[in-house]
Structures are given as structure tokens and as C-alpha cells.
């Protein structure tokens, strides 16, 4: 601490002062830190490493985009938010798409919940449509269930 310089920082970022007083300026976000610990342990024990997580996430996204693109090419029943020709710009965490109108979109959301127990698919309020959030903790089996539902709903409503 001998070379301490007063840099004019606010006291929350003056780590010299905190170390000197053997105290911290504020309480750290302990719940967020604990949750992060649990997620990192899960990733280490179940997934192995970040490269494996990336492979799994790419696999989940590809599964949904392949179904959407295949059906779009046949009759444009599902309309991906980002077209296939721009697939390098597609999100692997949020797969967004539209149906042909608000009525069929509402029917899709209702049947997804009632028949397949798929919840939280309603798109962002400013964009509408459907948004499947397939973040790290979403198992591949759940994404497969959604892909099956997409095909089944299309077959019954095309």
C-alpha cells in the first residue's frame, strides 16, 4: 500500500481504502454470487467445459431453425424472424418466428401450453410472434419436444 495514489475515484472503487480499513464499502450481491457458483458447478459436473456448452447450444438452435426453415420453404406457415439467407446472424439463445396471423399465433400459444406444457413462448411485446428462449440450462429434450410440437401443429393447421 506504500505507493497509494489518490486517483479521485469514488470511495466504492477505492480498494486501497477498503483494504486499509479491512472493510468493504457495500454488501456484495451474495445471492447472485451463490447462484453463479451453482451454475458453474453444474456446468463443470454435467457439461464439462464451455466448448461442450457451445456444441449443445448450437445443436438446440439448429434443431429448431431446421424445422422452421423446412416448413417455411413448403408453405411459409412459420416465418423466421431472421431469414435463412442471414443464418449467421441468428441467435442461438432466442429463436424467434411468426405465424401467418394473430389468430393462428394465439391458437399456437394456447395449444403449446395446454397440450405440450410449453410455456413462455409469447414473443416480445414490440415484435410479437413466438420466441423460444433456449438458454444454457434448457435441456435438449425440451427443445426436441418443441420441435415435435412445431411439426405436429403445422400438420394439423396447414
Label for each model-derived stretch:
Residues 75-111:
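Conserved PLP-binding catalytic core of the aspartate aminotransferase-like
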Residues 124, 128-158:
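PLP-dependent enzyme catalytic core of the Aspartate aminotransferase-like
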Amino acid at each position: 500500500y506504500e505507493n497509494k495514489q489518490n486517483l479521485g475515484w469514488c470511495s466504492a472503487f477505492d480498494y486501497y481504502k477498503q483494504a486499509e480499513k479491512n472493510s468493504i464499502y457495500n454488501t456484495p450481491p451474495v445471492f447472485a454470487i451463490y447462484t453463479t457458483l451453482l451454475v458453474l458447478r453444474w456446468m463443470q459436473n454435467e457439461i464439462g467445459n464451455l466448448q461442450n456448452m457451445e456444441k449443445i447450444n448450437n445443436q438446440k438452435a439448429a434443431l429448431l431453425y431446421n424445422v422452421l426453415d423446412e416448413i417455411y420453404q413448403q408453405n411459409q406457415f412459420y416465418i423466421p424472424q431472421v431469414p435463412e439467407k442471414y443464418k449467421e446472424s441468428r441467435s442461438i439463445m432466442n429463436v424467434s418466428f411468426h405465424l401467418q396471423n394473430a389468430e393462428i399465433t394465439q391458437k399456437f400459444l394456447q395449444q403449446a401450453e395446454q397440450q405440450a406444457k410449453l410455456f413462455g413462448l409469447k414473443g416480445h411485446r414490440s415484435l410479437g410472434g413466438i420466441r423460444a428462449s433456449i438458454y444454457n440450462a434448457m435441456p435438449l429434450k425440451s427443445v426436441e419436444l418443441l420441435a415435435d410440437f412445431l411439426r405436429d401443429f403445422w400438420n394439423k393447421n396447414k
